[in-house]
Amino acid sequence: MESIINLIFYIIIFLILIDFLKKNISFRKNEPPRGGVAFPIFGDLPKLGENPHRYLTNLAMKKGGIYSVWLGDEKVFILTDPEAVRDAWVKQFRNFSDHPKTKSVRIFSGNFNDMAFAEYSQWKINSKWVSSAFTKTKLKTIGDLIEKESNYFIEHLKAYSNSGQPIFPKPYISKFGINVISGMMFSQVISKDESVDKGAMEKLTVPIQAVFKRLGADNLDDFISILQPVFYFQNEKFKRQVQEIYDYLEGIYNQHDTNLDTENPKDLMDLLIISTEGKERDMIIHIGMDCLLAGSDSTSATCEWFCLFMINNPDVQKKAYQELINALKDEDNKKFIPISKKDNCPYMLSIFKEVLRLRPVGVLGIPRVALEETTIMGYTIPKGSQIFQNVYGMSHLFVSDPYKFKPERWIEYKKQKDLLKEKEMQQLQEGADVVIDNKNNIKNNNSSNKPNSKTNSIFDDLDKVSIPYSVGNRKCPGASLSELALFSLCSNILLNFELKSIDGKPIDDTEVYGLTIHTKVHPISLTLRP
């Protein structure tokens, strides 16, 4: 018996040693640098900490724009160079068009039967239906819905402001985000009088938050196959949470199917049912889940960050408020700014861009898989490798004063771009050759692999280094909708209230990590403007 135990012990030690060597020794040529010594079994997972994107960004400063880490069984390549991301996501899109098939994603997506995580072949079909439905949806109708929900939101805040009580804004912002998406998608909204703590809000927000936390976490059973049995009960709980959202949307689907008027579709779900001739029930429900979760949560998270940065930067808040006042100088209603005034508020728009640069809600995006062996910026990427885009790292390592909240940088950037276009047009008219710099950004003139080197041709090229909605064919399809919702909600908050912390001190701006990053829970003080 003792000899058997000893044999098992030595076999385990041998397997651990083999795994350690596998993770730390490579004979493949031209592979990117490794992130450091990886532990057996767990790889680099224990090093990631509470905010993996910050650890990976710090690592990029040492290892460069492309490097590899081990997340359990998976060798993962981290792209923190914007040109590397464009090479993979745009130029080599077909090879990087699929996402990893993790257990968590399989559960959420109904075996990859949605938009966000579907395989390329299914994604092409689904995206065609969704794009067609979006095209047939009137932009004015969506704008009216957003403005209506913004009005309701402001009414709730006024009640708190009049009472003198501080407010925890997160549930109200979440309600706004859910109503915009569900109103557009299903023609159903949570009543303005319904509590944010009970009823439909409770039924939706609790499982939505749980699902986002799970999908964004470094789940051990998604990366270490031998640990999957240990997480059986956790996975069963996750299935129930996903099922709660599915059941809610299934009820809505059944109502739409029963009352469908093919001549007068009233929302996106009607249009999808008509386009698919009612044959893709499960797919439509899962696309609805994608929209409800991603659309509502990302917009809500960005609004939370907007409020925090306005409180922590009162001079910016004051300047933005004055711009809103000026935009309404010829309007009768001075207490609500419509979406039509968006282009009259360039400083507000620069604030949103700066918020998304500092705190892109999807800090690591959704990973991709290399379908075939390829090269990115001269480095070999083996077949089957997972690839992460470090959105957070790019918008910090390629920007001057990266940790400073500075909306003015976007105003100046636009001026420089416009001036450059004028010069290029002038050169073309004069018949001169226009030289375009396609310099490799991983290796700078000094052969350094530091991604934040100011010799890089894209350093401070903000549109290229700040990509909160990603790039390529599988970038966020709801970016335009999100921008409209953010402008309407955030501008009207600022127009009606002065935002402050309850103690007059700056609010902790450390993020809470997940598939989208949120602020920590904190109350704020609202002062109704005259």
UniProtKB/Swiss-Prot annotation:
Any one cellular-component term (Gene Ontology): membrane
Entry EC number(s): 1.14.-.-
Superkingdom of this protein's organism: Eukaryota
Residues spanning the signal sequence: none
PANTHER family: CYTOCHROME P450 307A1-RELATED, HEME-BINDING MONOOXYGENASE FAMILY
Keywords carried by this UniProt record: Heme, Iron, Membrane, Metal-binding, Monooxygenase, Oxidoreductase, Transmembrane, Transmembrane helix
Top-rank EC class of the record's enzyme: oxidoreductase
Cofactor entry: heme
Gene that produces this protein: cyp519A1
Entry keyword annotation includes Heme: yes
Record localization: Membrane
Residues annotated as binding heme: 476
Regions crossing the membrane: 1-21
Molecular functions per Gene Ontology: heme binding; iron ion binding; monooxygenase activity; oxidoreductase activity, acting on paired donors, with incorporation or reduction of molecular oxygen
Organism: Dictyostelium discoideum (Social amoeba)
Name of the protein in question: Probable cytochrome P450 519A1
Topology of this chain in the membrane: Single-pass membrane protein
InterPro entries tied to this protein: Cyt_P450 (IPR001128), Cyt_P450_E_grp-I (IPR002401), Cyt_P450_sf (IPR036396)
Entry similarity comment: Belongs to the cytochrome P450 family.
